[in-house]
Every structure is written in structure tokens, then in C-alpha cells.
Amino acid sequence: MNASPVRLLILRRQLATHPAILYSSPYIKSPLVHLHSRMSNVHRSAHANALSFVITRRSISHFPKIISKIIRLPIYVGGGMAAAGSYIAYKMEEASSFTKDKLDRIKDLGESMKEKFNKMFSGDKSQDGGHGNDGTVPTATLIAATSLDDDESKRQGDPKDDDDEDDDDEDDENDSVDTTQDEMLNLTKQMIEIRTILNKVDSSSAHLTLPSIVVIGSQSSGKSSVLESIVGREFLPKGSNMVTRRPIELTLVNTPNSNNVTADFPSMRLYNIKDFKEVKRMLMELNMAVPTSEAVSEEPIQLTIKSSRVPDLSLVDLPGYIQVEAADQPIELKTKIRDLCEKYLTAPNIILAISAADVDLANSSALKASKAADPKGLRTIGVITKLDLVDPEKARSILNNKKYPLSMGYVGVITKTPSSINRKHLGLFGEAPSSSLSGIFSKGQHGQSSGEENTNGLKQIVSHQFEKAYFKENKKYFTNCQVSTKKLREKLIKILEISMSNALEPTSTLIQQELDDTSYLFKVEFNDRHLTPKSYLLNNIDVLKLGIKEFQEKFHRNELKSILRAELDQKVLDVLATRYWKDDNLQDLSSSKLESDTDMLYWHKKLELASSGLTKMGIGRLSTMLTTNAILKELDNILESTQLKNHELIKDLVSNTAINVLNSKYYSTADQVENCIKPFKYEIDLEERDWSLARQHSINLIKEELRQCNSRYQAIKNAVGSKKLANVMGYLENESNLQKETLGMSKLLLERGSEAIFLDKRCKVLSFRLKMLKNKCHSTIEKDRCPEVFLSAVSDKLTSTAVLFLNVELLSDFFYNFPIELDRRLTLLGDEQVEMFAKEDPKISRHIELQKRKELLELALEKIDSILVFKKSYKGVSKNL
């Protein structure tokens, strides 16, 4: 029974020394097969031993031991199998991790070969013998030939070919991650930052800048494809018509610690765009925004692409040269494009002249323009595209030509496959391999890849493989030539770094001069006073809060009571005018004694209705609304007295904040006030003191009303004339004349006459009631005869009660919460909004811009000085070119 654990232990030791690799030969068994056979032997041996043990020992005294061992037998077997299973899983995981890289390479090669075979087979149907009319070597043939050579080398054990394959694999790995960090002193990234700073200072200056690589070429030269091959993404708009109508200032930033590929549009304040279809769409819209009548614009589009797979470069893509204007294009388009390109081709910019191999260099628009801007060819790099369209010997002669010599030479690239990639060719059986593509291209993209992104990535890989296979196949022709996109990238990195490095000292001198001028202006105009948009905003908010604090001290209970009392006085006058002053029996109130109890009851009920209408008119909401409006109006007055009056953004924010704070307590305050005045709706108890105050207030109120009526009547009389007004009034008072002609009187004159009659009657009534109030109405007993006094007393009680709760529920809450809420909303404002607010004032805008210019110049000068200090310890940089 002890044989099974011992054999398992021996087996584990043997398996531990067994190599876990995948054998390609069918005659060699894998470790899994050996392990399975050994496990079978273990089980058979253990079973045989157990049976033998039971048969040979039949003693009754040993039955308990036998039974216990039989029971433990499954446990031993199960434990052994579990240990073996765990070991198998461990070895399988080790084997999978060992072969993962190899499988990935095989998968990439298989997919590319399937694509090439599909293209070759489809080409056999449409072309003669599978060869294109352009004379290119079919990609599938190149890949197949390369694969056959590799297999033959492996069978023969040729060490030289193995070394070549290792070099190619190493090149592929180096291409996957850009090595900008290892190039020279890695100064390009810092100098591109300086260039970006200088562009912020003055983007239109041709002197205050560092060199860039300016890409020029005709529309069919493959200019856009060269840029996309450097970036590794398709993002530039293409089309049969001219789609590049504005310069594209492209900045590539190497981010070694990031797996994302993102795009920024700094001038549009759009950042971290991961969808390059969106980038392409935006570039198309920005270019198409240029009117057809203008065709091209000098306003650049600023685009920054960040990735671990791009070098640190600063490029400018210009509109392609044309030979003949189209019918829908302006006649001066050719001249406009030439003038725009000349602006960017000036020193110290590097010129990247793109020319197609199938076009004679004598007709190259790019070389012609570069020769005009750089006669000696010291700043020009020639790039020859579409080398696969010509014979290798001719391609070599183009790259090594002496007719059009350039100091930096020519670089040959192939940026496209012989035929465009069709989606149906992405899979072996006509279907897009979505799963495999996702595994390849979604790495580092956090799930952002889609079918279109996969297609773009596949195009770049296939293009790179095609270029690599072509130059490898024709290696003997391009021995002494500079070819491949990788070589172009390396050359651009070195040249740009050297050019920028050489331009640092003269640029530093210019920056110092500009800084001195800016500092002098800043001192003269603003006395070196530091001001930021945020500090300007906070200073104005502090002034606003101080004004609100003063308003809080002035706006106490008496102010609130006067506002509410004035409104209720007007309501009292409206009630009196409606229910009393139009009553024909008003004269009866002046008699010493009413004729009957019925008449007395009539005036008593009339007073109750008037009082009820006053108390049930919605005092809660009326008083709350009046208080709210008074606060908002005073807040507007405070804003108008500060510098915020010129800033609509902050004025709206302050007003909306105040409205929200007041609205939060509006309904609860109105309900509280309404509940407090509820007893006055049923019974109003007046003391003699209240009556006396109300009587005096009523007299003053009637006097003011009488004064206003007399003033208005006198104004009409002066405007029309006393005699003419008397005639009109006499005519209107005679009712029989209303049915006849107007005797030449205008409609306006008749309206003035009607108003004068009304005012005359109202003055007589007010004079009559004023005498009544002065001579009588001395006590509450006469409240039915003196409704003016009674209603005035009621309004006074309503006002006093409402003010108590308005002061507590609304005012105190507003003055406490408004500054807090205002600060909270101000913190939510972004830097862009704060800067926009500050620049609404022209003087402040000038202050901030001049100060920002001074700070940017200081920052650029500091960075340049640090690079120059470091550069002194580095000699012979230009010798690496």
C-alpha cells in the first residue's frame, strides 16, 4: 500500500526536471503524453499491490487493518491525482508563458500572409499573371519567398541567416516603442516645449521661434501618408479635391509611461481625444470652414499627438502644390499656396520635400520650392515615396542622384501597400477577424478600439511589413541608400534636435531683448503690479460682499415696513375707490344721523366686505414678493457701483445665486406670514391709540391723493388750454351730444376731456372725505362712517405682523446663506471662465496679457539657459548626423 505515494514522489521529481516546451516534431512525445502514461502505470501498480496484499493475508486478526487500508486507498489515489493535476496545470501555464511571444509573432505573420494571398488571388482574376500594371512585386510572393528562405535556413542550420532573423525581430521590437529617450541628449522634447511657449507669446512672429520640420509636396506625392507613417495612425483628411486648406502645426510628444494614444487641439481647448476618427472629422471640418472663394487660409490648426510610439517632433503640414486650378477654385489659388509655403520655408525651419518616385524630379514642385528657399540645400531633406512603383535600379539612382544634390540626402519610403486594404480581406474566409484584431490593437487602448480602428492599425502593420519585405528582397540595390520609414524617423529626430540646438543661442538673445521691452512696458503701465484673473475676480467679489454688508445694516425692519406699508396703502385706496368713492350715496355718510337702521346695516356690511378683501388678498405672497424684489433691486444697484457692472458673466451669476437663495425660502415664508395674519381675517380689535394713528395716516394719504389728482388735472389744462378744455368737458357732460357729431374734436382731445372730468369728480370726493376725516372720525365708534381710517388701521396691523416673520424667515436667512452659496458657485468656475471674465474689461485684459507675456518669456529664457548650460558639456553633436 505504500508503493503508491512513493511512486508519485519519484514521478514528481522526474517531472520537475523535464523541460516544458512545445515540440514541433510529430515523432517526439510531449510531456503531457509522458505524464499520462506514467499516471496510468501508477494507478495499475497501486491496484495490483492492493489486490495482492488482500489475497496473501487472510488472517482474521488482520481484517480491521485491511479494512482501514482499503478505506484509505481512495484517499491516497485521490491525493496523488490531485497533486499530479496541480503539477500539470503549473507546467501548462509555464509552457504557455514560454511560447506566448512566439505565438503572437506567428499570428501576426499568419494574418499578413492570409491578406497577401487574398490580394494575390484576387489580382489573378483582374490582372495578367498576378502582376500589377505598376510593375511592383506582389506582396504575397515576397512574404512567401522570405518564409521559404527562413525555413531553408533553419533546416540547414545557417548561422548567418539566423542572425539576420534575430536582427529583424529586434528591429520589430524597437519599432513598437519609440526610442526618443535614447536619442542624443533627448533635448528635442525640452526644445519643443520652448517652441510651444514661444508660440503662446507670439504665434505670428517669424523670429521669436525655434525650427520646425515643414512638410511640402504636391497633392499626389504621398505627403499625408508619410506623416501618418511617422505617427502610426490615420488621421489626416484625404480626398480628390483639395482638403488641406490650412497649415497643420503637428507636435508629436513621446510619453513613455502611457499606453494611450491621444490627440489635443490646444487652440480649441480640446484635450485627450482617443478616437482618431473624431480627429480626422474635426480636421476636415476646420479645413472645410475656409470659404471656397479663399481656398486657403494662413491661420494654422494646432494639433498635438501624445504616444509612447511617436518621436518628439515638431512638424508643419502645408497645403499641397497644384499645377492647374479647378473650375470651382479661384484663379489665384496657385499663388496663394506658394506664398503660404514660402512663409514657412524660411530659415531656420527644416524642409521635408516629398516627391514621388514615378515622377521626374525635374518636375517636382517640392524640390523647386525648397531650392528657392534653400538654394544650397543645407536645410532640405528629400523624401522619395512610392519606390515600389519603379525598378529597384531606378529607385537607387533617384536616391543617389547628383543632379539635385541635398546636403542631408534623400530617404526612400513606401508608405502604402500596392492595393488598398479591403475589409473583406481582413480574414482568411472573407470575414474580419474581430477577436484577433482586438487582441492585437486594443492593447493599451483600454477598450477604445473598434472595427475601424483595427482596420487602421492593420493597414499600418501591413504597410510596414510590405516596406520591410520590399527593401529586404532588394537589399543589394539599396546597400548605400537611406531607406525605410524607421530611417526617416531617426534622421528627423537628429536633424531637428541639431537645428533646434543651434538656434538656441540666437533665440535666447531675441528672447532677452523681448523680455526687456516687455518688462519696461509692464513697469510703466502697471507699476509691476501682479494681477491674475482669479485675484481680480476675488477682489471684486470682496467689494460686492462689503456692499451687501452695508445694505444689510441699512435694510432693517423699518425699511421693510415702509415698503410693505406703501403697497398696502395703494391697495386701500383701490378698495376705497371701488367700493366707496363711486357710490352715489356717499353723501349720506356725512350726515349726523343715518335715516334708518337699514342704511346703517348697508354701510356696515360694506365695511366688512372691504376689510375682508384687504385681509384675504394674499398678504403672505405679496409681502414676500415685495421683499424679494427689493433685495434684488438693491443688489443690482450694488453691482452697478462696482467694477462688476462691465462683466455680464459674473453679474448673471450673482443675480442667479441671489434668486436661488431667495426662492428656497419663498414659499415657506409666504405660508408663515399667511398663518400669522389669519386671525385678522375674522376679527380686528382696534384700540384708540391705533385709531388715532390710523386717522392721521389716512388724512395724509388723502391729501397726497388729492394733490396728485390736482396736479394731473392742471397738467391737462395747461396742455389743452383752459377755455378749450372747458368746452370739451361741457360737450361731454351733455349726454345728448354723444349721439351727434364731434364738431371737429379729435379723439385725443375727447380722451383728455374725459380724463379731466374724472379727475374733477375725484378731487371733489377727496375734498369732501378730507373734511369728513378732519372734523369727525375721532373714535372707533364711527368706523362705519370713516372706512378710510379703519382700513388704514387694518393695513398697519397686517404690515407689522408680516414684517416680524419676513425679517426672521427671509432676510436673516438670505444675508447668511447668500455669501456662502456665492463662494461655492465661484469655486465651480473653470480657469477659462475666470480668464474670460477678467478679459471683458479692456484695461484688465491688457494687464493680464502683458503680465502673461512677461512670465512666458521668463520661462522660455530659463529653459533655454538650462539647456545651454548642459550643452556646454556635450561636444560634437552635429558629427552624428
UniProtKB/Swiss-Prot annotation:
Region G4 motif: start-end pairs: 385-388
Known EC number: 3.6.5.5
Region feature G1 motif, mapped onto this chain: 217-224
Organism name: Saccharomyces cerevisiae (strain ATCC 204508 / S288c)
Reported impact of Y520A: Dominant negative mutant that induces fragmentation of the mitochondrial network
Catalytic reactions of this protein: GTP + H2O = GDP + phosphate + H(+)
Entry keywords, A to Z: Disulfide bond, GTP-binding, Hydrolase, Lipid-binding, Magnesium, Membrane, Metal-binding, Mitochondrion, Mitochondrion inner membrane, Nucleotide-binding, Signal-anchor, Transit peptide, Transmembrane, Transmembrane helix
Result after altering G79 to D/K: Loss of function; most MGM1 processed to s-MGM1
Domain remarks: The paddle region plays a major role in driving mitochondrial inner membrane fusion. It binds lipid membranes enriched in negatively charged phospholipids, such as cardiolipin, and promotes membrane tubulation. MGM1 dimerization through the paddle domain promotes the helical assembly of a flexible MGM1 lattice on the membrane, driving mitochondrial fusion in cells.
Binding site for GTP: S220, S221, G222, K223, S224, S225, G239, K386, D388, T415
Protein name in UniProt: Dynamin-like GTPase MGM1, mitochondrial
Domain Dynamin-type G: 207-505
Biased composition (Acidic residues): 160-176
Annotated Gene Ontology cellular component terms: cytoplasm; microtubule; mitochondrial crista; mitochondrial inner boundary membrane; mitochondrial inner membrane; mitochondrial intermembrane space; mitochondrial outer membrane; mitochondrion
Mitochondrial matrix side: 60-72
Outcome of mutating R824A: Loss of GED function
Effect noted on mutating S308F: In mgm1-6 mutant; temperature-sensitive mutant; impaired fusion of the mitochondrial inner membrane
Effect seen on changing E294K: In mdm17; loss of function at 37 degrees Celsius
Keyword Mitochondrion: yes
Outcome when changing K854A: Loss of GED function. Abolished GTPase activity
Residues engaged in binding Mg(2+): S224, T244, D317
Effect after changing T244A: Loss of GTPase activity. Abolished GTPase activity
Membrane-crossing segments per the record: 73-92
